[in-house]
UniProtKB/Swiss-Prot annotation:
The glycine cleavage system is composed of four proteins: P, T, L and H. It comes from Shewanella baltica (strain OS185). Binds 1 lipoyl cofactor covalently. HAMAP family: GcvH (MF_00272). The glycine cleavage system catalyzes the degradation of glycine. The H protein shuttles the methylamine group of glycine from the P protein to the T protein. This is Glycine cleavage system H protein.
Amino acid sequence: MSNIPTELKYASSHEWIRKEEDGSYTVGITEHAQELLGDMVFVELPEVGDTVTAGEDCAVAESVKAASDIYAPISGEVIAVNEALEDSPELVNSSAYGEGWFFRVMPSDESEVDALLDAEGYQAVIDED
């Protein structure tokens, strides 16, 4: 069974967000998602300064099994990307909620966070799959 930290919020498309002290949100994919994808071989990230829109694809995770679009859980400006993933995409597998984060977003509409799932709601989504 996948680890689902209770302090994070989740999208039904298997992304997570964590609020940071500066008001931005760090985005990654869940442990469940990386388990489904398998060993990561390449991650394509948005550029710093890009504007992302909630529900739209903005990154790609490529594994030995498949390439999967990564969707923005909230809208805003990308203020940082995890450059470590360029050389070490396997961090997504080994540390989905830590060193395997994808990018950080400064939200344009923080109310979008309220539409995301808590850990219990995300567990229900996994159970339906």
